[in-house]
């Protein structure tokens, strides 16, 4: 870059940073003073109105809104300060020169910053309509759309990018085509060093279209590993929060991901963009949050482990319960229950029948016959509550008379009545809960009945397996979707109307029924679905999911930015698919190496010593948790800093890690070492997809060890795509 251009940009940066510092100083002084005043006012109000009479209550009611207004103003100013402090660290990352009626230079950053007296904008928020021009892929004619939906044509004369630290200008790039390879790689340092970071400075044109898309309420984003699906989704969340800031907040958006560990891994992205983190969850946590489903269920990761070792009937059960055929059958079965066959429990208190299953059926099919199933059941609940109160009152009186006749109870009549009520309330509590929670409907019988009614030899075996699991009070993961859906349709659920948008990561691992259950839980939500059909951990039939969303756009990202060209080519060859277009750097080819078992620890230690440095990340992957634990026990004395990542892990850790391959999905590491790539271990139908996921975690270095015979999934890869070495 020519010196006079550099000097000019440095002067501009210095001026902007000085203005930012001035605003920050003013706000810090204001907030310090405001905080002190608020504390004093709260203490004064608390002291003065500690004893509220009617008259003083009126005074308190007039003071409270004023105090609340001051607190809201404090929160708002503090939010503005946080954004200015972000800008102070790196004021902007881009500049575009556009010609409308006149030539204008616009600087693009994480938030808007302007002159208060003139209203002139010094830094444009990257999410503003005009900032979309920065992410276009060419100079010349372009347009942007303003909120009134008016199209504004402009000429883009220059696109410039910066790397900035406080008031220091580190790098300048001029790009005719937005972020060419050289610029992209200068800006995209190895991100596998830490938690996921924002990609706002390196958003590509195809990614920008996804982030800003408003043509459909729902979107499915498909793409290979490293295409930025999750990163784009996080930027899309930030964009939606900006675009709809008057009606949408972080508490209205939910991200459903495979694990709490992954939620922690991405937890820095939105704060880096000046936004609060959204609501994070997992499918398993949604199940646990539902009332009236008391049985323990295995987690997603426990399910993966079980299926890796499962016999044929367990595998058939998983595929069958996740199939579209069963989903369609279950939906029809539930509709049929409106006419006949809904199973009820008889409710009793002690040995005395409170209401029989026969009477419940009479109420359901005769008295409330014209209503939806869940409304009928709520009518029955309302019908039973007066009877319950009457039974309790009679029981209390009987117990009171009993206590009066027993010498050991000493006390007056009030004491005896109080004791009677306490005992009866405790005795009737289970019955009260059963009525309140519609526990008189046999949900498990509905579920098992829907399986048995398929009337095939396969269904019969799966029915018997499911019965055994229910008796053991331990559900499989594949039971969660059907049971949550049945619960929602039959008993109804506490629907969350606050969530307006949901991002589901790894949608390829969700069944149709799981998705239907999520829709039931969050009826007001629109969806952004992220997936890659080749990264299947739990194979399900998922083609039906996008069909459930009437207004949906399906977008495919076909470029990978994560790994070197060599690793990306190797990854593509695992599944014998067309090469994924890699925009990564050039690097060393993957190493596929046979080692003797006796040398395994020495070889792994050598890899760690050669490839691991501070501010990089290295992971050792095995197929399952048992193998990881065994290897960890062998390595922990020779590599003291190694950390085993378990299924229960909730906090992402940096450094040298060891974890099962299925847990690595979504993460990226500078170096990946697959420690057990033998045919005897990876020989299942879906193991090639697991290996595809495992190799695609590496950004710079990929090493694969095997002991006897390399798995067929990797053996079929052409030899010029990797290096080999055999130890004698």
List each model region and its residues.
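Conserved helicase motor core of SF1/SF2 NTP-dependent helicases
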Residues: 268, 272-276, 281-285, 292-300, ...
